[in-house]
A protein has these predicted regions:
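Short, conserved turn/kink motifs that form compact alpha/beta structural patches or helix kinks used as
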Residues: 21-120
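Active-site-proximal polar cores
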Residues: 1-34
Length: 120
């Protein structure tokens, strides 16, 4: 079963690298050019009155983990990093209160889902 999942994840990584959307990932003044897949993610958050409400990220980026390299070191996303699309739109790595800004998508840590909010 692991072999099948590995092949599927590897195929998805290869597809993103070949057909994905070009972005620039920024940490301070250090850029990383990479291809990503984009979507949106819904979160359930406490509404402060004993209930919950649904909050959507402005954009969720699916990134091959091996492509997040700064100064020769593999890194993981950090809150307040910036992702800039090829059209100039900018997104800050953020998630609703109590949620993680990113997580690995697969059991082999080959893909990362990054949650963001639009900043311009």
């Amino acid at each position: 079963m692991d072999a099948l999942i590995t092949k599927g994840v590897d195929l998805l990584v290869a597809t993103i690298r070949r057909l994905g959307r070009q972005v620039t990932y920024w940490r301070a003044t250090q850029p990383i050019r990479m291809k990503v897949n984009t979507s949106k993610t819904a979160f359930e958050v406490d509404d402060g009155y004993g209930g919950t409400r649904i909050v959507w990220t402005d954009m969720t980026f699916l990134v091959p983990a091996a492509d997040l390299v700064l100064g020769g070191q593999k890194v993981t996303p950090q809150r307040h990093d910036i992702i800039e699309t090829d059209t100039g739109l900018r997104y800050e790595v953020l998630a609703p209160a109590g949620q993680s800004e990113w997580q690995y998508v697969d059991p082999f840590n080959k893909l990362i889902r990054i949650h963001t909010m639009a900043i311009g």
